[in-house]
Regions:
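Non-transmembrane, aqueous-exposed alpha-helical and coiled segments at domain scale
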Residues: 1-313
Length: 313
């Protein structure tokens, strides 16, 4: 990979340990995927925040990076392994909480905004059309590529953190226009009436489109919360973290409609519900906000609970 003189100095350790390690990660990644150079990113979103995933080895590594590592661009965090404020009420052990808080402290010393959310675009990390990013969380990556029209691969936690320290990422994959061309036309004939239908639609398209970029038509109207739900679902069940939705995605009119076509009928939506739903009689826990709720969604939940009491348990 071709490096500038400044990038080579970073790789040689002239800007400290954290930047050097980051350059080692980024150049190795670039070599693997055939990137010719690094490109500047406007923001980063880091996953791999939970102590459950990182353990003591991860904590030690992050503390080492935090000694001299400071992020060069706006950087936000994915959710941690617990609620940072109400962990005791949720039955989290003090031992786990202590280690999780040490991880958060390390990220904070790096200059990262400790947002702990999978919807960074709702809390200030909102990129512009065409900007290059290094984001990790799959639904957020899909939203950035498909709704905003920014450009990001689905980064791993280490590569995203490395991009934050350097301010750059290898130029490959969805950073390149030739890799952002739709492969399959998806015509939606089904009625998509409520929020959960968007999750079902994402399931149906993800299963049919598989690992392809969809050009979606037939959508009459959609709001931000519905797009958020759809992005989380479609990438979970098989599709690439980029789609073009006519009337939504910037630049859709510049894309050629693919020859391959799949149709989404009402039966596909019903099939999605049948496959996703777990039919249980006893519910122990209700979790709201995956991806994290918008203010509008929280307001709706509050309205539904007005004057009611949550069951004991």
């Amino acid at each position: 990979m071709q490096l500038t003189k400044q990038e080579q100095k970073m790789l040689d350790g002239e800007e400290g340990y954290a930047v050097q390690k980051s350059m080692e990660i980024l150049t190795a990644l670039g070599d693997i995927y055939g990137a010719k150079n690094l490109i500047t990113v406007s923001s980063v979103q880091v996953a791999g925040v939970s102590y459950h995933n990182l353990g003591d080895a991860g904590l030690e590594f992050l503390n080492e990076l935090a000694k001299d590592g400071r992020v060069k661009v706006l950087t936000t965090l994915n959710p941690a392994g617990m609620d940072l404020e109400n962990w005791q009420q949720l039955g989290i052990s003090p031992e786990f909480a202590e280690k999780q808080n040490l991880l958060i402290d390390a990220f904070e010393r790096m200059g990262i905004l400790v947002s702990c959310t999978c919807t960074p675009y709702l809390i200030g990390n909102l990129p512009l059309y065409g900007e290059h990013l290094a984001w990790s969380e799959s639904s957020a990556v899909t939203f950035a590529n498909s709704v905003i029209g920014a450009k990001t691969n689905r980064e791993g936690g280490p590569s995203a953190l490395a991009a934050a320290f350097v301010g750059k990422t290898p130029c490959y994959g969805l950073h390149l226009d030739e890799n952002r061309i739709p492969d399959v036309h998806v015509q939606v004939n089904a009625e998509i009436a409520k929020l959960s239908d968007w999750g079902a639609l994402g399931y149906a398209i993800g299963k049919k489109a598989e690992n392809k970029i969809s050009y979606i038509t037939g959508i009459k109207s959609v709001d931000l919360d519905e797009l958020k739900s759809f992005c989380a679902s479609v990438v979970t069940y098989g599709a690439k973290p980029l789609f073009y939705m006519k009337g939504v995605t910037p630049g859709t009119e510049l894309q050629t409609q693919p020859k391959e076509t799949v149709i989404i009928e009402q039966a596909d939506i019903k099939n999605a519900y049948d496959n996703i739903n777990d039919f249980v009689t006893d519910i122990e826990l209700v979790c709201v906000g995956c991806p994290h709720c918008s203010v509008n969604e929280i307001s709706k939940v509050a309205e539904l609970l007005r004057g009611k009491k949550v069951a004991e348990g």
